[in-house]
């Protein structure tokens, strides 16, 4: 079925996945709060990433670095001078746009070219396209543009009681630098030999000019990043390894391979630190968007931090007796983006035999579903016994307890939030200690002893 972004956003708000930020005060543009179901979904996504990329990996360990860092970190990394977006203003609407995204949206929506990439174009090239194509402001419908200029994306604040340049610090625009500055600490304390990786999940902040598309692009976002260090010359081999590993992680969580594609960056599109980058993109209802960037960052970051800090980041290879600065492969995934992708991918509207109304269902992998099961007493008279099952299972799983409205409406409600199993406690359950377990996707029902529920859910929800 063709999926509509407005419908998915409406469901997310209605069912408690995502709410507009600061809603009672009119909101704040492109800020979102995760509701009770959204925080469970996102936490499950992060847990699944950590499980496969850190806990079960023979190579990798994790850290949690500070958001606020010494400003010299950003000077060394190049963010103070180079972390900019091309900005253009419409003089009539007074609205500011990212020039590259303005062009890409036009090429996709008007020209039908979903593969056009403006990244890597010079200011002059972008302005020429805007002028030649007659691209207009979506609000004012005029082409009365300023020149394109640089706009630094870092949020600036001050540490201490005085607001002067000596106390100027920044909210981190990426989690990666916290890993690089801790490279020696981790390598020595954990006695790691190459190749090895350091992973992190954490918030980052970018003062994006044109954030949008729900939680796809926001100024405050969460990243799941791995910096994988290897011997120079082996970086492309390891980049290919992590491309496959990342793709397999997505499909193992039921993401449709038909909605995914790998796109290699052209040479003129590569970041200044990269010699090879591949994006895993997902086909959202609004078009293709980057989920995962898998970049070979060479030795750029460690080399720059060595130059600015005076630290020696060379690795002594015990096998060859060489000393060299390791190369780095970075699989960087946006937690909010991939959560949105799983939400879009899971959404479906299905016809139901014997009913004129379609059912809305979220086909989440059970490991990602906010609730693994819902306990449904057939009558409120049975709630006292049914709640005992909830108490038994909720110590191991996220479980819902729902006793209001008809059993059919409760089934539909659980389908709509992606609960894989509904457990109905009826009057026969009082006698035979069995319950009816309904499968979300097939809608098939089986009778099962209450004593077997924990083992059943453990098997069905494992990842």
Swiss-Prot record:
Positions with a binding annotation for ATP: 206-208, 216-221, 290-291, 334-337
Domain of life (superkingdom): Bacteria
Transcription among keywords: no
Record-linked InterPro entries: aa-tRNA-synt_IIb, aa-tRNA-synth_II, aa-tRNA-synth_II/BPL/LPL, Anticodon-bd, Anticodon-bd_dom_sf, Gly-tRNA_synthase/POLG2, Gly_tRNA_ligase_bac, GlyRS-like_core
Entry's localization field: Cytoplasm
Enzyme category, top tier: ligase
EC numbers, comma separated: 6.1.1.14
Gene3D superfamilies listed in its UniProt record: 3.30.40.230, Anticodon-binding domain, Bira Bifunctional Protein, Domain 2
A GO BP annotation: glycyl-tRNA aminoacylation
Residues that hold substrate according to the record: 98, 174, 221-225, 330-334
Disulphide bonds in the chain: none
Its biological purpose: Catalyzes the attachment of glycine to tRNA(Gly).
Sequence similarity: Belongs to the class-II aminoacyl-tRNA synthetase family.
NCBIfam families linked: glyS_dimeric, PRK04173.1
Protein name in UniProt: Glycine--tRNA ligase
Annotated gene: glyQS
């Amino acid at each position: 079925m063709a999926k509509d972004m407005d419908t998915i956003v409406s469901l997310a708000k209605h069912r408690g996945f995502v709410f507009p930020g600061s809603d009672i005060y009119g909101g704040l543009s492109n800020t979102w709060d995760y509701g009770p179901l959204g925080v469970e979904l996102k936490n499950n996504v992060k847990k699944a990433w950590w499980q496969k990329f850190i806990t079960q990996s023979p190579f990798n360990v994790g850290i949690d670095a500070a958001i606020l860092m010494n400003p010299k970190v950003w000077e060394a990394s190049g963010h103070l001078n180079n972390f900019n977006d091309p900005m253009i203003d419409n003089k009539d609407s007074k609205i500011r746009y990212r020039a590259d995204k303005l062009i890409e949206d036009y090429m996709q929506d008007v020209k039908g070219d979903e593969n056009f990439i403006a990244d890597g174009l010079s200011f002059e090239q972008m302005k020429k396209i805007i002028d030649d194509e007659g691209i207009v402001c979506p609000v004012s419908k005029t082409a009365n543009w300023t020149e394109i200029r640089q706009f630094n994306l870092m949020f600036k604040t001050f540490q201490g009681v005085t607001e002067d340049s000596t106390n100027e610090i920044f909210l981190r625009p990426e989690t990666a630098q916290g890993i690089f500055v801790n490279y020696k600490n981790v390598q020595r304390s954990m006695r790691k030999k190459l190749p090895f990786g350091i992973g992190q999940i954490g918030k980052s902040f970018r003062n994006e000019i044109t954030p949008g598309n729900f939680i796809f692009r926001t100024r405050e976002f969460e990243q799941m990043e791995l910096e994988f260090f290897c011997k120079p010359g082996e970086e492309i081999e390891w980049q290919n390894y992590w491309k496959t590993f990342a793709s397999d992680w997505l499909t193992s969580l039921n993401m449709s391979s038909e909605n995914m594609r790998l796109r290699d960056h052209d040479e003129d599109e590569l970041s200044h630190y990269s010699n090879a980058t591949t994006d895993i993109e997902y086909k959202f209802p609004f078009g293709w968007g980057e989920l995962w960037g898998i970049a070979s960052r060479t030795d750029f970051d460690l080399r720059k931090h060595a130059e600015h800090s005076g630290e020696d980041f060379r690795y002594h290879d015990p096998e060859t007796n060489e000393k060299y600065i390791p190369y780095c492969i970075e699989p960087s995934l946006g937690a909010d983006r991939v959560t949105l992708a799983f939400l879009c991918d899971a959404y479906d509207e299905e016809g139901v035999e014997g009913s004129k109304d379609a059912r809305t269902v979220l086909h989440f992998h059970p490991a990602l579903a906010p609730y693994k099961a819902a306990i449904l007493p057939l009558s409120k008279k049975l709630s006292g016994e049914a709640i005992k099952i909830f108490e038994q299972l909720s110590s191991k799983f996220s479980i819902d307890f729902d006793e209001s409205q008809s059993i059919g409406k409760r089934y539909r409600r659980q389908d709509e939030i992606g609960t894989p199993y509904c457990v109905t406690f009826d009057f026969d359950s009082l006698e035979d200690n069995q319950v009816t377990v309904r499968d979300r996707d097939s809608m098939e029902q089986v009778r099962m002893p209450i004593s077997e529920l924990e083992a059943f859910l453990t098997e069905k929800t494992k990842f």
